[in-house]
Amino acid sequence: MSKKLVQIKNLKTYFHTEAGTAKAVDNVSFDIYKGEVLGIVGESGSGKSVTSLSINRLIPNPPGEIVSGEIIYNNTNLLDLSYDEMKDIRGKEIAMIFQEPMTSLNPVLKIGVQMNEILIKHYDLNEEEATKKSIEMLEAVGIPSPEQRIDEYPHQFSGGMRQRVMIAMALQCNPSLLIADEPTTALDVTIQAQILDLMMDLKDKRKDAAILLITHDLAVVAETCDRVIVMYGGEIQEIATIEELFKNPLHPYTKALMNSIPHMERKTKRLKALKGMVPSILKMGDGCKFCSRFEPEECPCMGTKENQELFEAKKNHFVRCKKEMISV
């Protein structure tokens, strides 16, 4: 295994609301290795995006707060840095493609102004030099007539085009860690493939670069990732290599996700689905998060309603459920 690029230890990110404290990320620990693509999958509300925002120190406070934990990057705990020190890392060393392209761009500034800003700040380029590089990046992500489009406003771009602009901005500085939160949202499958290839090119150009890919699309995960984290209820439920996860999923929730994928060889008229909906994080409590979605004998707690510890079921394959459920 390569050297660790980022170590996340016992991360807790909570949101304090009138209805109570939402434990959006609750005691999460994992490593990101140099040169790897690590995927985080899970349903909406599982804590995927909050985890990524925590790494970049972008949790809105109030109501959010990183309560405790460590985020170690280059032997430095990012949670100990000042606001200005974090600004020197954000965008240059750790970049992010945000989930909402329709609202992530400033509507009153031209695309060129927003793209040039990061280059002027981190590389001390003048306006002309920054514009030239920004045009090259727009062309690289497949935006036609980039010399013209760079002087247009966000409302003149479609949702898919705005997403490509966001991706171009994130790749401007060849970051060590690219956090991609649903990077192919609003894109058709052809452009999805182009964007994923572009992200892989970044990793190939910079041998020690890593990608944290957040998605709900297991097909994208299978195509791009080296390892996968499955999240639910603000906690990690399973971690494994991509081959191991698809070949031998251990957690009941992971198995249910896999069974919900349509397969060509299966002649079924109806897709399998998990029972119910993801409950509010406020209503999950500290016990087992799955009791409302599984029958007691199939639930990770096996009917005890107690939350389970994450343990190593086999080498580099971690799972959070009763040990009696595991057959490796």
Please annotate each region the language model reported.
Residues 183, 187, 191-269:
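P-loop NTP-binding/switch modules centered on Walker-like glycine-rich loops
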Residues 4, 144-148, 241-328:
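Short catalytic/signature loops enriched in Gly
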Residues 172-176:
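A short, proline-enriched helix->beta-strand linker immediately N-terminal to the Walker B motif
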Residues 70-77, 128-148, 258:
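Conserved ABC ATPase "signature" region
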Residues 78-95, 121, 244-249, 279-285:
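ABC ATPase NBD coupling module
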